[in-house]
Amino acid sequence: MKRIILALALLSPALAGAQDLRHPWTLRECLDWALEHNLTVKQSELNVAQREIQLNTSENSWLPNVSGSVNESLSFGRGLTADNTYTSANTTSTGFSIGGGMNLFDGLATPNNIALSRLNLEAATADLERAKDDIRVAVARAYVQVLYDYEIVDVARKQIELDDAQVARLEALAATGKAAQAEVSQQKASRAQSGVTLVQAENNLRLALLDLGQLLEFSSSEGFSIERPTVQVEEILLDMPERIYADAVGVRPAVRAEEIRLKGTDKSLKIAQAAQYPSLNLSGGVGSNYYTTSNAAYPQDTFWNQLSHNFSPYIGVSMNIPIFTRFQTRNNIRSARLNQELQQIQLDKAKQSLYKEIQQAWSNAVAAEAKYRSSSEAATAAEDAFRLTQAKYENGKATITEFNESRNQLLKTQSDRVQATYEYLFQSRLLDFYRGSALGL
């Protein structure tokens, strides 16, 4: 019984996950799940936690360090006694001490190191937000791809329904001698080709769901589906890339992280320069000893009396003045200045990359908008043309070849319209996302 209970306990997370997959997932659910389970995001979260520890360590560097020690020694033969004389005897010595030291001045290296640790934490937090943004975009893109493939499957199924109706119609006409058997066979061939198209569309849908499930770190995407919201394409007046970039550069975490790191290089330079200045340290402590000597010619003090008599506190201040460090300090300063220039280039590259991304998204949105308009017009025209061709075909005024050509053209224009719809929807939302808006449909 215990084994059964244990097995059920181990299986319960998997069963809970399977139950979660039984309902269609919304985009918000997918995004929330991905942010919680994505390994890259988890790695960035651990990096933030590590930086928090480093900041705490830096802040505590102002505190004094305190340590204690206990020693016990035993000497044989001629040795030094407690009264500072030498004699041939066995001598034991027990010592106790506690001491500490504190940094008073180190050329402002400590406050700059604390500031650097704080900036490193801010940069790590920005990196975490960047990782989250990357997974948000990837999940949204995959989600839209699934929606597109759903629509293509619907289009393919409608074509099969149309072909089935035509096959049934021709078979009925052929039975009465009003249609040739060749027409029936040709229509069945068209029906078979539509079946192949449907199989391909369904396979593409399964692959799209698999891709989305992998982004969500699902161990299995079996039974996984998404909610199909009502998509309404609105006419959006797109701002120019320059204006979008002006809004985005101040909020994008990728740029903000590099800006913070550039500030950090200034602190690193000051830390390197601090090695040019003298350092001042305070130290102090207390200690005591206890001695025993065999064959002593006089009575020895007790343990506690000796500790009291030998008690010796001390305090001191030391200054370390750098004179020649084999050019290490000079080279560290040079290296810190070079790191500043390198980080400035890294910041410029991040801004340049952001601008290119916005330009690409803007160009894609403009192209998708134009394609959506033209494909919508083409699909409407193809629907009208197909209705006319279908009516002619059913009245014997059009051939089956003309009918199938019109049907194939309708399928193509409908597919193009669906693709343009979701591409325009995603690219326009992506531009809003660059400006700081949440991703959504």
Language model region names:
Residues 1-33, 202-243, 297-298, 432-441:
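Terminal intrinsically disordered/low-complexity segments used for targeting and assembly
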Residues 19-145, 280, 284, 327-330:
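Short flexible linkers and secondary-structure junctions
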Residues 118, 181-190, 400-408:
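Short, charged, amphipathic alpha-helical segments
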Residues 18-67, 71, 77, 220, ...:
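Bacterial Sec-pathway N-terminal export signals of envelope proteins
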Residues 193-218, 379-437:
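Short segments within alpha-helical structural elements
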Residues 134-247, 364, 368:
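Periplasmic alpha-helical coiled-coil/stalk elements that build and connect Gram-negative outer-membrane
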Residues 42-46, 59, 90, 104-132, ...:
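Sec/SRP-type N-terminal targeting helices
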Residues 19-23, 69-102, 228-237, 270, ...:
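Small/polar, glycine/serine/threonine/aspartate-rich low-complexity segments that form flexible
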